[in-house]
């Protein structure tokens, strides 16, 4: 008779434990009901990136001294630097500089260690193309600065959207 009583007690304890777990998960779900949605309508609304965001690399051709520090610090030896030595002035002359963003891991080492600060990170993150060879940017494409999200008149940022966060929190008043 005792095994049957202990079996009923174990069954009761397991039932209470299962009900408690279900109740905890239900309370978690209810606590998230009042939160605002995080989803944005991507092509029409964009988030403003932070100052430390690592987007596409910007390159200034006139500042580069062809020292190849960017190639040495890159974990995948990505930047391609073509230069020639001018013997009359005993300096390197930069011929071509390119980065393939299909391979780049956006670590920022090239920007950090560049002695002349000719490399910088921009806030551009839309690099999608239909052909992977279009992601190989030369010095001309790297020199173009992207349009800032804040200055782009075709994009509504989250801060300027007509449904601001304060309006979304307040429920509409219904008068009878």
UniProtKB/Swiss-Prot annotation:
Q: How is the cofactor bound?
A: Binds 2 [4Fe-4S] clusters per subunit.
- The entry's [4Fe-4S] cluster 2-binding residues are 74, 104, 107, 110
Positions of [4Fe-4S] cluster 1 binding: 64, 67, 70, 114
Provide the top EC class.
Answer: translocase
Q: How does it sit in the membrane?
A: Peripheral membrane protein
Q: Pfam families of this UniProt entry? A: Fer4_9
The record's subcellular locations are:
Plastid, Chloroplast thylakoid membrane
Q: What is its main location?
A: plastid
One GO cellular component, as annotated: chloroplast thylakoid membrane
GO MF terms listed in the record are:
4 iron, 4 sulfur cluster binding; iron ion binding; NADH dehydrogenase (ubiquinone) activity; quinone binding
Which UniProt key words apply to this protein?
4Fe-4S, Chloroplast, Iron, Iron-sulfur, Membrane, Metal-binding, NAD, NADP, Plastid, Plastoquinone, Quinone, Repeat, Thylakoid, Translocase
Q: What is its EC number?
A: 7.1.1.-
Alphabetized PANTHER family for the sequence: NAD(P)H-QUINONE OXIDOREDUCTASE SUBUNIT I, CHLOROPLASTIC (PTHR47275:SF1)
Family membership: Belongs to the complex I 23 kDa subunit family.
Q: How does it assemble?
A: NDH is composed of at least 16 different subunits, 5 of which are encoded in the nucleus.
- Known function: NDH shuttles electrons from NAD(P)H:plastoquinone, via FMN and iron-sulfur (Fe-S) centers, to quinones in the photosynthetic chain and possibly in a chloroplast respiratory chain. The immediate electron acceptor for the enzyme in this species is believed to be plastoquinone. Couples the redox reaction to proton translocation, and thus conserves the redox energy in a proton gradient.
User: What name has this protein been given in UniProt?
Assistant: NAD(P)H-quinone oxidoreductase subunit I, chloroplastic
Kindly list the organism's lineage. Answer: Eukaryota, Viridiplantae, Streptophyta, Embryophyta, Tracheophyta
